[in-house]
Amino acid sequence: MARKCEICGKGPQFGNRVSHSNRKTRHKFNPNIQSVRIEINGVSRKVKICTSCLRSLKKSV
C-alpha cells in the first residue's frame, strides 16, 4: 500500500497527457501522500495520509 491514504483510501488515478498535436499518452496521477505521526486512541502511530486529510486533521485540532 505505497500510494494510498490510510484515512480516506485515496489512491492513484489514471488519465492522459495531451500534447499540442493532441497526441494522448497514459499518465498516472499519484495523491500527495505524507508520512505523519498521529496520536490515535492515546497511542502515537506513524501513518501515511494525503494532504487533504492532513489539512482536515489540523483544522479539527
Curated annotation (Swiss-Prot):
GO terms for cellular component: ribonucleoprotein complex; ribosome. Disulfide bonds: none annotated. GO terms for molecular function: structural constituent of ribosome. It comes from the Bacteria. InterPro entries: Bacterial_rp_bL28 (IPR050096), Ribosomal_bL28 (IPR026569), Ribosomal_bL28/bL31-like_sf (IPR034704), Ribosomal_bL28_bact-type (IPR001383), Ribosomal_bL28_sf (IPR037147). Keywords: Ribonucleoprotein, Ribosomal protein. Coiled coil: none annotated. GO terms for biological process: translation. NCBIfam families: L28. HAMAP family: Ribosomal_bL28 (MF_00373). Belongs to the bacterial ribosomal protein bL28 family. This is Large ribosomal subunit protein bL28. The lineage of its organism: Bacteria, Pseudomonadati, Campylobacterota, Epsilonproteobacteria, Nautiliales.
